[in-house]
Amino acid sequence: MTETSYTYNELRRLAKGSDGNDARIAVLGDCSTQHLSTAICGSCKALGIDAAMLDTEFDQVRAMIDDPCSELYAFAPDHAVIYLCAEKLAERFCAEPSEKERLTFAERTAAETAALWQRFSSLRPGARIIHLGPAMPYDGVTGSLGNTTPSSFSYQLRRLSLLLCEAGAALGCVTYLDLEALQGQVGRDSFYDPRMYYIAQMTVSDAALPLLGGAIADIVAACSGRALKCV
């Protein structure tokens, strides 16, 4: 698939015809993921994969993964898409009480995320995790200086991405999908609409959802043997 193959509305129509016989995909996020789930389902359908989707409750990632009796495990997914967005990470970072805590933000967040992966993997062995790495937001405060300032959010976010890649490689059941790279294909202004985040907690615009949904569908297709791709 390519980012120009389908519009979001076309993917939404495709998703309505999916019977869920080929793959079971759960989507967990600390932001709104309803439209993302639709884009994934429609993108899978475009690749010939009928996907059953579970769009879990808003901002219930840890609760769903920690509880063995949650609807996540009752759904028995083949793939779990986990999205911990940069906007919520920024809120947590800004709430850190001192520079000392900010200097270790990436390490602590990576450890927490890896623990979630391990918990899910232990309760749902054989399932694949597709973790959406955070896209870098606009930093009008520190600018380029933030890239070499360890206590800045941009520095910690870049470090977090590296640590998550290392943790995912060690665990073996994680595919790390870099939203920063996808955002670079279409530009930040096209990928992210700040108005939609503050209105509906949506971090990916409808215009960019086909790109993201297609990237996730490509991973699902590769893992199911329907496509050749380095996952």
Question: At which residue positions do the language-model features occur?
Answer:
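Alpha-helical cap/lid subdomain in secreted, periplasmic
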Residues: 15-22, 37-39, 47-56, 62-210, ...
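Terminal, non-globular segments
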Residues: 6-8, 23-24
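Short hydrophobic beta-strand that contains or immediately precedes a catalytic carboxylate
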Residues: 26-28
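Conserved helix-turn-beta segment of the N-terminal RecA-like "Helicase ATP-binding" lobe
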Residues: 44
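Contiguous, structured surface segment used for ligand recognition
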Residues: 32
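Membrane/wall-proximal cationic-aromatic binding patches
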Residues: 4, 10-18
